[in-house]
Amino acid sequence: MVAETPEITVRDNVEAQVYDALIGDQVVGSIVYERSGQRLVFSHTIVEPEFRSRGIGTVLVTKALDDIRARGMTLTNYCEFVADFIAAHPGYADLIDAEHPGHPRRRRAKGVEGAEGA
């Protein structure tokens, strides 16, 4: 039997400078960022432990990157989870700011789950 994943809503909480993933009214994940002109700077992604391994991080990153593209903005990335996502989905690589890319993709140590947990 396959468990259904509840519908995930992603919103940009501009005042708090986070993209939030919600199931109903509950925030289950976030991408923390700062805005610098027409560029967002991602610092880290968090998914609450009890909601990990359900694809929430993937939905959150996808919708946040789609929003950046729709706004005509660029991204400086310091989050390894987002770096791994972009490496696996190179169609988003053009969003990385050429002058301020952040850090290059780094692999996590084998067997070590990052704090992000997707």
Annotated model-derived regions:
Residues I23, R35, H44-T45, N77:
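Residue-level recognition of conserved beta-strand positions in structured domain cores
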Residues I31-L40:
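Conserved donor-binding loop and adjoining core beta-sheet/short helix segment
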Residues F42, I56-V59, N77:
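Generic alpha-helix structural propensity
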Residues T45-R52:
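A short, internal acetyl-CoA/4′-phosphopantetheine-binding micro-motif in the GNAT/acyltransferase core
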Residues S53-D66:
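Conserved acetyl-CoA-binding loop-helix of GNAT-fold acetyltransferases
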